[in-house]
From Swiss-Prot:
HAMAP family referenced in this protein's UniProt entry, alphabetically: NusB (MF_00073)
Gene that produces this protein: nusB
Top-rank lineage group of the source organism: Bacteria
A single cellular component GO annotation: cytosol
Protein name stated in the entry: Transcription antitermination protein NusB
Function: Involved in transcription antitermination. Required for transcription of ribosomal RNA (rRNA) genes. Binds specifically to the boxA antiterminator sequence of the ribosomal RNA (rrn) operons.
UniProt record, GO biological process: DNA-templated transcription termination; transcription antitermination
Stretch forming the signal peptide: none
Gene3D superfamilies per UniProt: NusB-like
Organism: Colwellia psychrerythraea (strain 34H / ATCC BAA-681)
GO MF entry, a single one: RNA binding
């Protein structure tokens, strides 16, 4: 089964955030390149842009939400795991139309696809704790 356009947008957003973290290139350049490089793929461009811009613009508050629930400094977290967590936390905070279970499940699936073997367990644990702070009403 093909991934939905929104799932593909999340996947590309994680890759773009990773690229931004590692390269320190301007976000606009990364965004333009990702859209151009993936022009033939079916994905939700607006959602991709929302996630990428949202993470890079709100990085301080996103990291503040993550820090209490990790057992090491953010700089010591694998770059892929960090990108996944940042996209998911932004989505939890700012995309309240998306159920938190969907956000966490998508992040787990991304970790299984792109990160180290047991990364999905780490991502799940951090997000499970973070969601209680961000969306206590759910």
């Amino acid at each position: 089964m093909k991934p939905s356009p929104r799932r593909k947008a999340r996947e590309l957003a994680v890759q773009a955030v990773y690229s931004w973290q590692v390269s320190k290139n301007p976000v606009n350049d990364i965004e333009v390149n990702f859209i151009a490089d993936n022009s033939k793929r079916r994905f939700d461009i607006e959602y991709f842009q929302l996630l990428l811009r949202g993470v890079t613009t709100n990085i301080g508050s996103i990291d503040e939400a993550i820090i209490p629930y990790v057992d090491r400094p953010l700089d010591d977290i694998d770059q892929v795991e960090k990108a996944i967590l940042r996209v998911a936390v932004f989505e939890l905070k700012d995309c309240t139309d998306v159920p938190y279970r969907v956000v966490i499940n998508e992040a787990i699936e991304l970790a299984k696809s792109f990160a180290a073997d047991d990364s999905h367990k780490f991502v799940n644990g951090v997000l499970d704790k973070t969601v209680k702070l961000i969306r206590p009403q759910e």
